[in-house]
């Protein structure tokens, strides 16, 4: 089940990242400004703000199997429709559609893990699951300009190709995802259909620990989406070819895969997880600043550190939510919906502000300062976490 969920999360990462390496040809073909392109790359995050919470509740009621199937189908449609865009409005709408299917996947896969795994296994499984999205992003960034675009001939055909790949993955889940392993305890498999939900949402809203993690999540999405969506263009303006810029950005994502796998395991060795989160935020801010100001070896070091420390935040925050007594497997969909709904405010603002500040100042450096300042400032929130967290 973890491997099937990984494939769907791979499709998720592939689809949402595919626009980033194609920014230049899309802007030229459709006549878009940097502000418009920033709005496009942040469109699905904007929809997340309104869709994630109700979809999280639906996932708790509908179950993981149907939810992940619907999510995989919708994000594949989002990719296909991007190829038909003739202007800003059409491209914005097709990317925004991802904000309907995306939550079904990004909330559904953690719920899948919370049902199938317990204890330390959840940390490892969350890291592996997160690597699916990261590998999808890495493939989109590393292969789009160097292999896929030359093969299919046009940026529109790239989106068609990735959409068909997504539909293929949805078909695999349709055929195999509904058959739980006989080694899985029945009470765990059935828990998704027999939840006790009285007063759940009201109790969740009163939990201070959940809100602190949500605030940190806002900045994670701000930095992650803001940097990943614009890094290829930043590197191109520093003199890299589109293919090399894609390779470099995929290297950041590969570093993020390692961070997602290593840091959650390391986290269990420490009594104070807030120290882990504070370290991730501080180093991420430094790395982002180095990317904006550095050249040569320093630039490469910044790319590697930004990927490792920024990406590692996601599984750490997810595991902390899972392990809260008020959450667990039973209410992970509801809490995940809250996390993504509010967190994706940052997911929209990151890409949008990077594009807007580029138009205003004619430099990406102002956007880099914005991301760095927000990341560093959020370390204050870690002080409010309970010491046992």
Q: Which positions does each model-derived feature cover?
A:
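A late C-terminal transmembrane helix in Major Facilitator Superfamily
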Residues: 327-363
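C-terminal transmembrane helical hairpin of 12-TM major facilitator-type secondary transporters
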Residues: 273-320
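Conserved MFS/SLC helix-loop-helix module at the cytosolic interface between two early adjacent transmembrane helices
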Residues: 50-88
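Extracytoplasmic gate region of multi-pass secondary transporters
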Residues: 19-20, 208-250, 256-260
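Residue-level signature of mid-helix packing/kink "hotspots" within the transmembrane helices
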Residues: 17, 45-53, 138, 253-261, ...
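Helix-loop-helix hairpin linking two adjacent transmembrane segments in secondary transporters
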Residues: 129-178
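Cytoplasmic helix-loop-helix junction between adjacent transmembrane helices
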Residues: 94-133
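Cytoplasmic membrane-interface "Motif A"-like loop-to-helix N-cap segments
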Residues: 61-71, 268-281
């Amino acid at each position: 089940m973890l491997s099937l969920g990984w494939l769907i999360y791979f499709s998720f990462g592939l689809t949402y990242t595919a626009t980033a390496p194609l920014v230049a040809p899309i802007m030229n073909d459709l006549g878009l400004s940097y502000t418009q392109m920033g709005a496009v790359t942040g469109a699905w995050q904007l929809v997340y703000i309104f869709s994630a919470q109700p979809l999280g509740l639906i996932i708790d009621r509908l179950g993981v199997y149907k939810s992940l199937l619907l999510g995989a189908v919708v994000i594949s449609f989002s990719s296909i429709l991007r190829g038909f865009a003739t202007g800003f409005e059409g491209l914005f709408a097709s990317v925004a559609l991802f904000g309907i299917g995306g939550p079904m996947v990004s909330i559904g896969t953690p719920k899948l893990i919370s049902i199938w795994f317990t204890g330390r296994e959840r940390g490892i499984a969350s890291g592996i699951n997160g690597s699916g999205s990261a590998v999808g992003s890495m493939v989109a960034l590393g292969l789009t300009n160097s292999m896929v675009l030359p093969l299919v001939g046009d940026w529109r055909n790239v989106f068609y190709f990735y959409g068909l790949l997504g539909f293929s993955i949805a078909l695999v889940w349709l055929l195999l995802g509904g058959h739980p392993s006989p080694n899985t305890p029945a009470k765990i498999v059935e828990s998704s259909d027999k939840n006790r939900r009285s007063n759940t949402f009201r109790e969740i809203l009163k939990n201070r620990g959940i809100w602190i993690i949500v605030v940190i999540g806002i900045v994670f999405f701000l930095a992650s989406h803001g940097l990943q969506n614009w890094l290829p263009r930043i590197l191109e303006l520093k003199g890299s070819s589109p293919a090399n810029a894609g390779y470099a950005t995929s290297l950041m994502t590969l570093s993020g895969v390692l961070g997602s796998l290593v840091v959650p395991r390391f986290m269990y060795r420490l009594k104070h997880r807030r120290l882990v989160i504070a370290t991730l935020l501080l180093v991420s801010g430094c790395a982002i600043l180095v990317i904006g100001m550095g050249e040569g070896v320093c630039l490469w070091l910044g790319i590697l550190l930004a990927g490792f420390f920024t990406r590692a935040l996601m599984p750490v925050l997810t595991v902390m939510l899972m392990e809260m007594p008020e959450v667990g497997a039973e209410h992970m969909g509801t809490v995940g919906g809250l996390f993504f709904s509010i967190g994706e405010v940052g997911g929209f603002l990151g890409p949008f502000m990077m594009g807007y500040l580029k138009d205003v100042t004619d430099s990406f450096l102002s956007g880099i300062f914005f991301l760095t300042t927000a990341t560093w400032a959020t370390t204050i929130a870690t002080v409010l976490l309970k010491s046992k967290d």
